[in-house]
């Protein structure tokens, strides 16, 4: 399919007169179009769930979550990777984003970078991609050369390939192990895929990373438990998380945190199981750090 034939490049008849609308009418037009994004993403929920279920065992066993894209798609991937690091206590080696053109492309357009097949291969070769890794490749059009080449390279290495695009049956969708294709339709401003397509990508990446982290034991109940107390503020936050998770007092949470040497998951298991440090550590080791599984294992043993 020619680029100008793509749905993402078509004119939107609902916004043809946006340049003549009042400011309120203009933002109402944009808002109405944004409502279509959530519905489009909703149709992809089974595929998103399947991708999460395929990805989290790899991540849980040491695989890396790697985002790849060009332009807006690449920047959104870098952002998701960067944000989930402090949220779930990850390192920059466990999850990161690769964008066509490298770091300069985060703030400037790097000419021709998105068209380079060689650059994609070099970028993934440089991080020593393995079959244990997960590659999330995003391109609104589904045919960006850099992104396609990255996904092809990932397939050759045996890595899990998740592909986001907004065009049905795109080359990216056909190449991915798990294609996720919310068809959001033409943009309010013709071809400006930073709008609905970008919003859809942000929603999908949020779901993917959150789902993988939850399934990998980085969350207990709905609490971020991998907070690392490094100062007064984060120490207070850690105490509150422990207290809420275990329905205990802040004082009891503080004592458990001290016993656990500031390791929040260990402190939670200590309180929930009423065991010793050694027993709590053994439970976490047996469940690969999953707090909920550690608590369940303790219940079975007693």
UniProtKB/Swiss-Prot annotation:
Q: What does this protein do?
A: Specifically catalyzes the cleavage of the D-lactyl ether substituent of MurNAc 6-phosphate, producing GlcNAc 6-phosphate and D-lactate.
Q: What is this protein called?
A: N-acetylmuramic acid 6-phosphate etherase
Highest taxon listed in the record's lineage? Bacteria
> To which protein family does this belong?
Belongs to the GCKR-like family. MurNAc-6-P etherase subfamily.
Q: Which PANTHER family match?
A: GLUCOKINASE REGULATORY PROTEIN
Instruction: Give the first-level EC class, as a single word.
Output: lyase
Which CDD domains does UniProt cross-reference here?
SIS_Etherase
Organism in which the protein naturally occurs: Levilactobacillus brevis (strain ATCC 367 / BCRC 12310 / CIP 105137 / JCM 1170 / LMG 11437 / NCIMB 947 / NCTC 947)
Q: Name one GO biological process term.
A: N-acetylmuramic acid catabolic process
Q: Where is the SIS domain?
A: 55-218
Subunit and partners: Homodimer.
Q: What else is known?
A: A lyase-type mechanism (elimination/hydration) is suggested for the cleavage of the lactyl ether bond of MurNAc 6-phosphate, with the formation of an alpha,beta-unsaturated aldehyde intermediate with (E)-stereochemistry, followed by the syn addition of water to give product.
Catalytic residues as annotated in Swiss-Prot or TrEMBL: 83, 114
């Amino acid at each position: 399919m020619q680029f100008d034939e793509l749905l993402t490049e078509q004119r939107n008849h609902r916004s043809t007169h946006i340049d003549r609308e009042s400011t309120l009418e203009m933002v109402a037009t944009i808002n109405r179009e944004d409502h279509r994004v959530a519905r489009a993403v909703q149709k992809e929920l089974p595929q998103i769930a399947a991708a999460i279920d395929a990805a989290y065992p790899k991540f849980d066993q040491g695989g890396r979550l790697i985002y790849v894209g060009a332009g807006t798609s690449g920047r959104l991937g870098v952002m998701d990777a960067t944000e989930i690091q402090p949220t779930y206590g990850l390192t920059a080696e466990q999850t990161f984003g690769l964008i066509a053109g490298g770091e300069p492309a985060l703030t400037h357009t790097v000419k021709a970078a998105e068209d380079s097949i060689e650059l994609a291969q070099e970028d993934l070769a440089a991080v020593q991609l393995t079959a244990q890794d997960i590659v999330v490749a995003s391109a609104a059009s589904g045919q960006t050369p850099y992104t396609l080449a990255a996904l092809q390279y990932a397939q050759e290495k045996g890595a899990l390939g998740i592909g986001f695009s907004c065009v049905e049956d795109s080359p990216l969708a056909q190449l991915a192990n798990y294609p996720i294709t919310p068809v959001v339709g033409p943009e309010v401003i013709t071809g400006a895929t930073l709008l609905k397509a970008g919003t859809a990508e942000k929603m999908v990446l949020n779901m993917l990373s959150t789902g993988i982290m939850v399934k990998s034991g980085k969350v207990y109940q709905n609490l971020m438990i991998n907070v690392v107390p490094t100062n007064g503020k984060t120490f207070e936050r850690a105490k509150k998380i422990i207290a809420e998770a275990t329905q205990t007092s802040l004082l009891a949470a503080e004592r458990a945190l001290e016993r656990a040497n500031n390791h929040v998951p260990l402190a939670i298991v200590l309180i929930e199981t009423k065991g010793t440090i050694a027993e709590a550590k053994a439970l976490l080791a047996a469940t690969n750090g999953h707090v909920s599984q550690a608590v369940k294992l303790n219940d079975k043993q007693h």
